[in-house]
Every structure is written in C-alpha cells, then in structure tokens.
From Swiss-Prot:
HAMAP family: Asp_carb_tr. The gene is pyrB. GO terms for cellular component: cytosol. It holds the Pfam family OTCace. Heterododecamer (2C3:3R2) of six catalytic PyrB chains organized as two trimers (C3), and six regulatory PyrI chains organized as three dimers (R2). One of its GO terms (biological process) is 'de novo' pyrimidine nucleobase biosynthetic process. InterPro entries: Asp/Orn_carbamoyltranf_P-bd, Asp/Orn_carbamoylTrfase, Asp/Orn_carbamoylTrfase_sf, Asp_carbamoyltransf, Asp_carbamoyltransf_Asp/Orn-bd. It catalyses: carbamoyl phosphate + L-aspartate = N-carbamoyl-L-aspartate + phosphate + H(+). Its EC number is 2.1.3.2. This is Aspartate carbamoyltransferase catalytic subunit. Belongs to the aspartate/ornithine carbamoyltransferase superfamily. ATCase family. PROSITE patterns: CARBAMOYLTRANSFERASE (PS00097). One of its GO terms (molecular function) is aspartate carbamoyltransferase activity.
Length: 313
C-alpha cells in the first residue's frame, strides 16, 4: 500500500493511533524511509502550516517545523504566550482565526486530553495534526518509534517489546502499545505499580524490571513526568531511588539479549530512567528516533496534504 492509495478521508486530520491500521502504518514507514533516502516532493500550489504548542517542546516542535520546511510548506509563526488565547480566546476560535487567514494545517500540542475532539471541522479547510494531548495520544512519536523498530528488525510480529516507567501519565505509551499490539508484537510493562493503569492489561503483562530487561528485543524507557504529578507523587521517589529500583543501570543492561536496543521518547533524565553512558552507547537508538522523527512527520504531513488535496493546481 502506498500513500496515494489512502482514501480521501483517511488522514484529513491526524490525531490518534486509532486512525492507523497495519497497512497504513507500513505505508507511512515506507514513505518516511523514502524521504530519509533523499526523495523529495513538490506541491504546485503553496501550503501554509502553523505550529500551536501550548506545552513546552524541543524535539516535537522543531521536528515538525523541519519536516514542514523540507516539504516546502510555508510556516506561519505562532507564539501561544502572545496569542489571543492568553486573553481568553477559545481553541476553537483560534483555529477558526488561523483558518480564515489561510492556514491549511494546524499542528497542535495541548495539556488537555482529547483537546482535538472539539476542533475537528472547526474550519473546513484547516487540518488538525495532534502533536500530543495531555496524557492521551502522541501519534507522531508512535509512528517514528515504529519506523525505528522496523529499521532495526524489519518486522514487528513476534518481537518482544518492553515499556518501562511512568506508564499512566505517558501519551507515548498509550499510542505505542495500541499500535504495536495491532502489529503482532508481544508487550511487557514494568515500573512503579502505582503508575500502572489496569486498562493496559489488554495489551500485555506487568512484570518486574529485571524480568522484563532480560527477555525483550526493544526496551522503551519513559520519562518520569514530574510536571503531571501532584505534590504527593513528586515525593514518591528521589532520583537515586528511582534509578536503583526501576531505572536501567549499567549492571542491569548487561542482562539484555544480544541485539536488543534502548529507545526513549526524550527528554531523557540521565541516571534516572537510564544510566547516562547507556544513552550514548551502542545499544541506544534514542538519537536515531529523533532523526527518524523528521522523515516520519514529513510522511504524516504529506498524507494529510494528499487527503485534503492541498497544494493541487
């Protein structure tokens, strides 16, 4: 399946893992690999994008902007702190405003889970691309993770994948586990029990960190998200205690399978989720994920552009 085979409605907006099936996942991976190999695309008419990030971001924000510029899109600057949202304007009215002035694609991140549900169709000629909603979904991180795993192993079916850490607060974990389960991977979870959601049982089992580390092909660490905790949770662990009990130490890493890899959505808390030297070690694919993120976001944006017929004469 290629991107040109997508139906017009498949990716008119790109907001959640539920939109992606196994065929479209592989089509996006293949297209991202094309871009990584140097393929380019040209749109006959101008396309305008705005990046509306209401939460702090380094990787996702700059990665989307790089993807937009590589595709030849015109990026319209948007600063939430100096926007009318700070004066009380609703997100829906913000989308209507940028749509009215001609923005085709709004890439958005917001702390509210499912914020995009009220924005889909707010302006008929403006597409919504979700760059992360609270603890809900993170489809572009999901897709770049899939690309990185496929690049390493060439398949998903039968792979053993472990996700460790702050599971209940992680939009990355939610998106990744849904898609990896669809693709036939075996999933294992580990971390503090109070940070685990029983709804994840449908995707895999919850085991100890040492048990998980020795049996997985992909070890995905999650950032400890202090900004989403209440005061009591912040005091649950010191960095040193967390690293010793739930982090990947140098000694624990020695028990990994040959050929197994580390992944992390970043930013990494060095010597908390993962020993600092392992972040830059030969088993780490953390910076490969960042590289792949640009090409995958190019593929995702192109899918939206094709579905909407943007840029056509």
């Amino acid at each position: 399946m290629t991107l040109s085979n997508f139906t017009d409605t498949s990716f008119q907006d790109f907001v959640s893992a539920e939109q992606v099936d196994d065929k479209s996942a592989m089509a996006l991976i293949n297209r991202a690999e094309d871009f990584k190999a140097g393929q380019t695309v040209h749109f006959p008419e101008p396309i305008y994008a705005a990046n509306l990030f209401f939460e702090n971001s380094t990787r996702t924000h700059t990665s989307f902007e790089m993807a937009e510029r590589k595709l030849g899109l015109t990026v319209i600057p948007f600063d939430p702190a100096h926007s009318s949202v700070s004066k009380g304007e609703t997100l829906e009215d913000t989308i209507k405003t940028i749509g009215a002035i001609g923005v085709n694609i709004a890439v958005m991140r917001h702390a509210q889970d499912g914020y995009y549900n009220d924005l889909l169709g707010a302006w008929p000629t403006t597409a919504i691309v979700n760059a992360g909603d609270g603890a809900g979904q993170h489809p572009s991180q999901m897709m770049l993770d899939l690309m990185t795993i496929h690049e390493e192993f060439g398949h998903f079916d039968g792979l053993s994948i472990g996700i460790v850490g702050d599971l209940s607060h992680s939009r990355v974990a939610r998106s990744d586990m849904q898609m990896l389960h669809k693709l036939g991977a075996t999933l294992h979870f580990a971390g503090p029990e109070q940070w685990y959601d029983s709804s994840f049982d449908q995707y895999g089992d919850f085991i100890t960190v040492p048990e998980l580390v020795k049996q997985v092909d992909v070890l995905m660490l999650l950032r400890v998200q202090l900004e989403r905790f209440n005061a009591d949770h912040r005091q649950a662990f010191s960095k040193e205690t967390y690293h010793a009990k739930y982090g990947i130490t140098d000694d624990l890493a020695k028990t990994m399978k040959p050929g197994a890899i580390f992944m992390h959505p970043a930013p990494v808390n060095r010597d908390v989720e993962l020993a600092s030297d392992l972040v830059d070690g030969p088993q780490s694919r953390i910076f490969t994920q960042m590289q792949n993120g640009v090409f995958m976001r190019m593929a995702m944006l192109e899918a939206v552009i094709n579905a909407r017929h943007f840029g056509e004469e």
